[in-house]
């Protein structure tokens, strides 16, 4: 019993993970309505994060792309990757740093819903980091 507890404790200390559920910002600027109409904004749908250092508003900007779906028709918006929006600026600096220095484990849609004609999308991100990367992350 003690060894199991100790193993779990050391696993968390030596190999911690950082996890968030974040809103996707700027969805009204992109093809999210068409993607939603095709039923692709489902929980668990895989997304890709791409840093955009040349962004004029935020040099740490991170784009969120919905991956292409192999089962989609050739001319649907799901056939090729679609830009959903961005990581919020409040988190973009740290997420951009983690994309360079840590292993992204999970990037998927947590939820998507409409409220008052506005689409809200949330993504779940999980990074596996070494203990020293976690320390560097928290002191940034």
Regions found by a protein language model. Give the residues of each.
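Conserved active-site motif detector
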Residues: 1-140
């Amino acid at each position: 019993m003690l060894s199991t507890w100790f193993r779990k404790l050391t696993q968390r200390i030596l190999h911690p993970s950082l996890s968030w559920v974040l809103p996707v910002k700027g969805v009204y600027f992109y093809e999210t309505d068409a993607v939603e109409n095709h039923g692709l904004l489902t929980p668990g749908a895989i997304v890709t994060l791409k840093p955009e250092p040349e962004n004029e508003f935020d040099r740490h900007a991170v784009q969120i792309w919905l991956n292409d779906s192999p089962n989609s028709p050739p001319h649907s918006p799901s056939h090729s990757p679609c830009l959903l929006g961005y990581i919020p600026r409040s988190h973009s600096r740290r997420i951009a740093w983690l994309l360079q220095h840590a292993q992204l484990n999970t990037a998927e849609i947590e939820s998507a819903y409409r409220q008052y004609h506005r689409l809200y999308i949330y993504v779940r991100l999980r990074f596996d980091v070494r203990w020293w990367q976690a320390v560097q992350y928290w002191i940034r």
